[in-house]
Amino acid sequence: VTAGPLAGRIAVVAGATRGAGRGIAVALGAAGATVYCTGRSTRAGRSEMDRPETIEETAELVGAAGGRGVAMRCDHTLPEDVDGLRARLERDEGGRLDVLVNDVWGGDGLVEWGLPFWEQDLGAGLHAWRNGVESHLVTSHRLVPLMAARGRGLVIEVTDGDRDDYRGTLFYDLVKASVIRLAVAQAAELAGHGVTAVALTPGFLRSEAMLDHFGVTEERWRDGVAADPHFAISETPAYVGRAVAALAADPGVSRFAGRALSSWVLAREYGFTDADGSRPDWGRWFADVVQAGRDPEAVDPSRYR
């Protein structure tokens, strides 16, 4: 058995319960890493998201992929919870941390669309900010010192979008733009410490929640295209997961410091594919079809996969 490119590496995926976080954790496991899968949803109890996926399930998938998965409940908005995670890394891994993925979101159900911000629920918007930005800052504040002390490491801030275009509703936009800015700021401050920080976005993500939204399974995902033709360019969480694994295995990753990267650009850079062997290019589709105002049903989606 050949050791994976990340054998012996220690990763934390904060927000590994479902969606991009789960895809990232599993891809890191497939590359041989030990992956701490953290979040609030466990077999003992659900988070406010009230969904069935759990961190234990993700850790088992990491193991099945060839890595070592460790599930640990952690509310990343609470410094004391993240301190507990750091203490466990110090105890069980000698304080080693090679890859930190800040993927916590927790904003579905808090973000409102179609209303001006002043008519939206302020408490819900601030809660989305706390879940989606404060959690990242708390986690980096407590865990980045482990990397800086060793003079090496990679921080990946998972966001939505790699451009400055407005995302349609204020609180959502503020959270996702701030996550990119966190990567920029961390990259600047960590440059002299051997640690690289980047932001990373998936395209149109076929998460568990998105499949539920369209009323389809992963096996029958194309049935959702009738409801939204843009869904034809969607991608599985494995795609952004493979992007993270490729970055983590790249000894020259510092060339990307402070950049907002995407699954589709990195697929071209590193040559990986989505789970079905295709390469969905949401960026090109967005430019050619969405921004150009073309009828998506008149465009052949296979040219963008």
Where are these regions (language model features)?
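Catalytic loop of short-chain dehydrogenase/reductase
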Residues: G106-L110, W118-A124, A128, L154-G192, ...
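Rossmann-fold scaffold of SDR-type NAD(P)-dependent oxidoreductases
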Residues: A14, L97-L110, G132, I156-T159, ...
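Conserved internal alpha-helix within the Rossmann fold of NAD(P)-dependent oxidoreductases
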Residues: G125, G132-S140, L154, D164, ...
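C-terminal helical subdomain
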Residues: E134, A199, E219-R305
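Active-site loop of short-chain dehydrogenase/reductase
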Residues: R9, G67-R68, G95-L97, M147-G161, ...
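A glycine/serine/threonine-rich, flexible loop-to-helix segment
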Residues: D50-R51, L115, G192, F204-H230, ...
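Short-chain dehydrogenase/reductase
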Residues: T2-G95, W105-W118, R305
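A short, exposed helix-loop element centered on a Lys and neighboring polar residues
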Residues: S140-H141, V184
